[in-house]
Amino acid sequence: NFFISYSALSAESSNKEIKDCWKGFNKATFALNQTLDGILFEPIAKGYRYLPSPIRAGTSNMVSNISNLATIPNNLLQGEFKSAANNTMRLIVNTTLGIVGLFDVASGLGFEKLDKEDYGQTLAAWGMGPGCYIVLPILGPSTARGAVGQAISFLGGDPWYNITSENDTRYFKDSDYFFSKMADGVDFRAKNLEAFESIEKNSIDFYASVKSLYLQDRERRISNSGLIIDAMDDSDWDEIESN
């Protein structure tokens, strides 16, 4: 399930502190997202896995490289200057030597791949509470704080969105932004087909399980602690997508 998987393992404070204030709406939206995933994104993800490993790795590397455009300002806003410098070097090296991000040259030069950062995480670092848990149509699990963070991205906080959808240059168009987001989601979904099938199969309450996984992983990302969930990877290309 694309909508749970892409957002659910992508990343808010403690489960015990976050209330499910709109549970009826959330469950209905969760069911809708599950249906859309089953008829659209899961089949696409399964087909995507038949592509040669270099193509899949290149796609993953490229969308990961693009994500640095939003991660770097959030590193700075959170006072994580070392991470900001690391991600800036990754962006420069992989965009140039890595041929617009197709190859992860930066890792081989000592600039490690770090977790993505977003405005929801920045708001948490600034002391804003998570608010209520919410499941958004298509976008999946979030919180009130996370939703505000997403709104900030669309209102000018995401440089990649500005470059494409806002036509800041003549080289890109809005379809490039949405294609990159779609590619990122399908790539992640393809790597975690078995993982989510297992969660769904072994969960007494799938909705509750996804909610718990999302909130736990969000807390991990905000606190910058260790990994909770491993994603599938193309080991031959040293390519791991844990977001």
Task: Cite the ranges covered by each PLM segment.
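Short N-terminal segments immediately surrounding and downstream of signal-peptide cleavage
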Residues: 11-27
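Alpha-helical scaffold segments that form or flank carboxylate-/histidine-based iron centers
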Residues: 24-25, 54-61, 84-94
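Membrane interface segments of multi-pass transport proteins and intramembrane proteases
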Residues: 39-57, 109
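Surface-exposed patches in mature extracellular/periplasmic domains of secreted proteins
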Residues: 54-57, 78-85, 107-108, 221-228
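Mid-length scaffold segments of soluble, non-membrane domains
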Residues: 65, 72-145
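A structured, mid-to-C-terminal "fold-capping" secondary-structure block
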Residues: 12-16, 126-243
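Sec/Tat signal peptide C-region and signal peptidase I cleavage site
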Residues: 4-12
